[in-house]
Amino acid sequence: MQIAEKIILCTHGYFSEKLKESAEMIAGPMDDVTTFCLLPGMEPDDLKGQIEPLLASCSAAVALVDIAGDTPLNVMARLSAQYPVTVVTGVNLPMLIEASESRTDMDYQELGTHLVSMLPSTGRVIQMKGAEK
């Protein structure tokens, strides 16, 4: 079994840093999570250059990105052709906490599948009585 040695959090703006800070408020320190921020004016190759040394230094990783079809995903997809990394889109707070807590319980590819399977359960519509019309 090849576990995810690292969790990569790669998003637009500072979302990844703030998401990690919020997760740590709930679950404690997440030393296994490294954040990467795509900032205005940054080229995809700049982001790739920041992430690649981390991937080169670990046995396997899971990368959590914010949205499908944009630069963070595209960069991680390119890197996944060279390194053992599973890329998951749609990162949210419950997913990050689950990734950190389950990282050593399953293979890095299984972890990616597990994280995607939990997406439907992380959103709910709550209607309070006062909202009725």
Locate predicted features:
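N-terminal loops that bind phosphate or other acidic moieties
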Residues: 1-64, 68-133
